Swiss-Prot record:
It is found in: Cytoplasm; Nucleus. It is an enzyme of class 2 (transferase). Belongs to the DNA polymerase type-B-like family. Mg(2+) binds at D106, D108. This is Poly(A) RNA polymerase cid11. GO terms for molecular function: ATP binding; metal ion binding; nucleotidyltransferase activity; poly(A) RNA polymerase activity; RNA binding. GO terms for biological process: mRNA processing; RNA 3'-end processing; snRNA 3'-end processing.
Length: 478
């Protein structure tokens, strides 16, 4: 099919700006670093056992893994069918590929054009996917990395797609390699990711916190700085072969990791203590690349803006992954680490995990219509603990476009699609067609049998009228 070039993308949207997660006036940090969390071997074993149980509930089922793969295969088929250019390729990155995905995580896909002239914008990609029945399409072309957000009703998969962001492939390989070194890494990663999601800590664009990739790097660096270390420095994993990025043989790294006998449950408590009390936010930089904690002054980041938390990007050391969080947000993050540590120290094994992952409730809740269905299998993660948690899938963090009711175009010829943009300062009643005719702002022809371009309704304040059996009832986005 011929991909159109848009002057104004009909799928254009933007990340929903939600309420800030942390209020600077409400965040209170604990000054004391006294540890009162000594646990005996029995309690340690119970906590570790509960961690493994939660991990088994959080990781995607075989059925979900299969659906994800079928969805990716479908995307490949769409590209090869409609854009017959051998230069185009796609790869999956992020949590799906690095083995840190929890149930109902989005699938992240990057399309590599390799100089192809047939696909050069996210708006063109959105148009192509719309023609293949993808729903809830939002094109965010003005983001630092432009993306297209979609939902495939066939496989019930939410997906974020970008074009030519190939650095994501390297980051994904790095995390996947770290996860494969020690069997404690993946359970820790999934539990911490779930905790961060429940506590609304990984929404950099929406509420000024950090990304899940950033907190994964913080976990890796925590494990690198244990004594003895569980994970090596990233530089130690780099290959001398110019044709590949990382080494293939990691047996030696696995053997070194076994020298650290700390249990899974103990590591989880230590992680929260480390970033709640021990880590020096004022002077330190998390460095996965070196496997150490760098000095902020020596790195030249002491005077940078939004540097209260510094997490070095492993492959672009000039970039701070945590610069999405300002000073109040970083203090809020630290307070959440402290809260988790306190709760992990005060309760029995079952209650510890249940309490730290209680869902954070914003005081000013956005209209629930924007958030998708929360009655999902993911809500059963804590079923055995007797906890009532509401879990939102990743894609539920973004509002869904308004979709008018489906109609069937009448047979024969072309039809006009008319839309009305109301003047909100002089809102009036539109109970009959006569009142609307004088206010029509524009129209576009539709070929008989084609679907009306519902995505030409990017904001909820538009009123739409279209030819149907009941012309007196326009679809309203209000």
């Amino acid at each position: 099919m011929e991909l159109l070039t848009f002057t104004c993308c009909p799928f254009e949207g933007q990340m929903q700006q939600k309420k800030r997660r942390f209020d600077a006036n409400l965040v209170q940090l604990q000054e004391s670093e006294h540890r009162n969390d000594q646990i005996n071997e029995t309690v340690d074993a119970e906590l570790t056992n509960e961690c493994w149980k939660l991990y088994m509930r959080l990781k995607p089922s075989n059925e979900e893994v299969s659906r994800r793969q079928q969805f990716v295969d479908k995307l490949r088929t769409i590209l090869s069918t409609e854009i017959k250019d051998a230069k185009l390729d796609l790869f999956v990155f992020g949590s799906t590929e690095n083995n840190l995905a929890i149930q109902q995580s989005d699938v992240d896909v990057c399309i590599i054009t390799n100089g192809s002239k047939y696909l050069n914008s996210t708006c063109q990609l959105a148009q192509l996917l719309y023609s293949y029945g993808m729903k809830q399409i939002v094109c965010v072309s003005r983001a630092r990395v432009p993306i297209v957000k979609i939902w495939d009703p066939q496989f019930d998969i939410h997906c974020d797609l970008n074009i030519n962001n190939d650095v994501a492939k390297i980051n994904t390989k790095m995390l996947r390699l770290f996860v494969s070194i020690d069997p404690r890494v993946r359970p820790l990663g999934l539990i911490i990711k779930y905790w961060a999601k429940q506590r609304a800590l990984c929404d950099a664009a929406g509420s000024g916190t950090i990304t899940s990739y950033t907190i994964s790097c913080m976990l890796v660096n925590f494990l690198q700085t244990r004594n003895p270390p569980i994970l090596p420095a990233m530089l130690d994993l780099m290959s001398n072969d110019d044709n590949k990025m990382f080494v293939d043989d990691i047996v030696g790294f696995k053997e070194k990791a076994t020298l650290n006998k700390t249990s899974l449950g103990r590591l989880l408590i230590d992680f929260f203590y480390y970033y709640g009390f021990s880590f020096n936010y004022l002077d330190s930089v998390v460095s996965v690349r070196s496997g150490t904690v760098l000095n902020k002054q020596e790195k030249g980041w002491a005077m940078e803006v939004n540097n209260s938390l510094c997490v070095e990007e492993p492959f672009n050391t000039a970039r701070n992954l945590a610069n999405t969080a300002d000073n109040p947000s970083v203090k809020g993050l630290q307070s959440e680490f402290q809260r988790a540590f306190r709760l992990m120290s005060e309760n029995n094994a079952c209650e510890r995990l249940c309490k730290i992952c209680e869902e954070y409730q914003f005081l000013d809740i956005t209209n629930e219509a924007n958030y998708g269905n929360t009655n999902t299998p993911f809500n059963t993660a804590y079923e055995s603990f007797g906890c009532n948690h509401t879990v939102l899938p990743e894609a539920a963090a973004y509002p869904k476009p308004y979709y008018p009711p489906q109609i069937t175009l009448s047979d024969g010829g072309n039809m006009n699609f008319l839309y009305y943009i109301p003047d909100e300062s002089n809102h009036q009643s539109y109970e009959n067609k006569a009142n609307r005719d004088s206010d029509f702002q524009g129209q576009t022809s539709l070929t008989q049998g084609s679907a009306p371009p519902w995505h030409y309704i990017p904001c909820q304040s538009w009123l739409v009228w279209y030819p149907s059996e009941d012309a007196s009832n326009p679809a309203s986005g209000n």
